[in-house]
Amino acid sequence: MRSFLTRRDFLERASCAGALLAVTGPRLDAGQAGATAQGQMYLSLNGSVAKGVGWPDMARLAARVGFDGVDWSLGPAKTAGLDATKALFAELKIKPSITNLPMARPLPFQGEQSAFDQALVQLAEDAGFTAAIGCDRMMVVLSPTGPLPKDEWRKVVRDRVSAVAQVLQRSNIRLGLEFLGVQSFRAGRAGGPPPNPFIWTLPETVELAKDCGPNVGVILDVWHWHHSGGTTADILNTPKARIVHVHVSDAKAQPPEEVRDNQRLMPGEGVIDLSGFFQSLKKIGYQDGVSPEPLGRVPAEMSPEDGARLALDTTRAAMKKAGVVS
């Protein structure tokens, strides 16, 4: 027996309950996207549910399915050009929600200082492009371990992130730091030395963000919040301005040591308190993007469009259940 729903299962069950329109709302065509009521959180398409779709097809898919925004790709958009990218978003009437910080690993946290300084020069140009198309946020992932003891590594990360934030601030861009709460990310390799623990909870990430600048905040991923032992109180204690973007999925009940990052479920299929999560965000005034990111959940045989629609439908249903969207 299947342990989770296909999109057809989801729609049939909702329809049989006489609640399809109440749960998912009417299907939006490309020209109708961006229809979330003003002042509410809005849904943004993330590439994890539409694998193999490049740019600008990802934006067109988002609009066609009914997302109000898209997690967009800076490199391909720059290749297409500023005017073409602005025209694309104007045509589709969706938002360029967020993009990755355009620094190749091991930057920004590791790597030679000279390489970092050079990357900051390019970042200024990329930030200008990002702002010009109407996007005001970027994101980067924090490793929960570091090459140095925690206090020493925190100073390095703080200094690097602060420098990045200063460049982004000139273009009014916010930077989101995504913490990784799954235990396996903090485990050392078998037979190797134990890693140096770093930051992997919401409160500590918020404190780091505060030390890095007014335009630095958190990418709040419900999966990592749940697996880090996060609480709704943690969210309620976070200033709205420090939450840059939100990722959502769901999780099955299993021992922490067995959890792997690609075992996620669609919102509503698992045990995460999504209603408490969304209601807490609403209470602090969060009104920005929410991207479904159920890594490993979309079957290989499912088309990108069906994957995107399933993510949209299940996420919207969870948000309606929580009372945060109409």
Predicted regions: what they are:
Residues 62, 70, 89, 130, ...:
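Conserved, mostly hydrophobic/aromatic
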Residues 68, 72-174, 224, 286-287, ...:
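Structural motif corresponding to the early beta-alpha repeats
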Residues 41-47, 70-72, 96-101, 138-140, ...:
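Hydrophobic faces of well-ordered beta-strands that scaffold small-molecule active sites
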Residues 1-18:
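N-terminal secretory signal peptides and thylakoid transit peptides that target proteins
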